[in-house]
Amino acid sequence: MQRSLDSLAGMATSAFGAGTSAAMRQATSPKTILEYIINFFTCGGVRRKNEAQYKELIDTMADTLKSSMPDRGAPLPENIILEDMDGCRVEFNLPGENNEAEQVIVRVSKGDHSETREIPLVSFEKICRVLLFRYEFSIPQDSVMLTAQGGMNLKGAVLTGANLTAENLCGADLSGADLDGAVLFMADCDGANLKGANLSGASLGDSNLMNACLEDTIMCGATLDRANLTGANLQHASLLGCSMVECLCSGANMEHANISGATLIRADMSGATLQGATIMAADMEGAILTRANLRKASFISTNLDGADLAEANLNNTCFKDCTLTHLRT
């Protein structure tokens, strides 16, 4: 019995104290020689059983939080109880009147026996917010809740038309996600992974996308006015018809991106890499391209009136039928 309680306490600590892929693997691996032997002869039976219990813990926690909170922005309850987890009671006691410690106390009990653990409050709150976020937007719960960097795991999530205004998505994994028509106005996506995501028609005005990975993203018709894309990776991104007025793209990597039809009036693209990029019928009036790498970029029927190309790399750059009046070089 003690070993069963210890195992469940370990799972709860890993799930709600770390929430990462590494934590899940460690918590669900066989622990004893006997478990390793059984796991071998059942082709991973022990691990599968542990993974099912781990997932049940997460699903039950999500349901409990949803039923006890008016909305996901509300304070977490000081005491959260998960009943009948494999015949056990799992209790999370947050700092407050009944817990003077700065940690969340996890207590797993069955009859007269119990096991106690402690987990960081910051990690616990972050994981609970992920569960509530996924619940609100009808995204199936996942055993991996956080990335190794501590961002939300939303890989492949369907968030079409979702209102994510001012949402904290720092370091989130949104690779392959569908954000068609989503509203991310003023969202903080610093360091987020959006590789291969669909952001067509999304509203990203005034958002923070510093150092975000937007490689291979589809952003046709998206609005990025005044967005901060400093240091972002936009290699092979499709930015057809995007509105990027006064967008900050300093140091961004836009190699082989398609920026045709985009509006980049007064955009700051200083030090950006646009090597091999396709820019057709774009409006780049007053754009700042100082020290930008424009090698082999193709500018066709693009308005570059008043643009600043001082110290830009123009090796094999093509300018065809472009407006180049008042150009600064």
List each language-model region with its residue ranges.
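N-terminal capping/linker segments that flank leucine-rich repeat
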Residues: 89-153
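Tandem repeat scaffolds
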Residues: 137-329
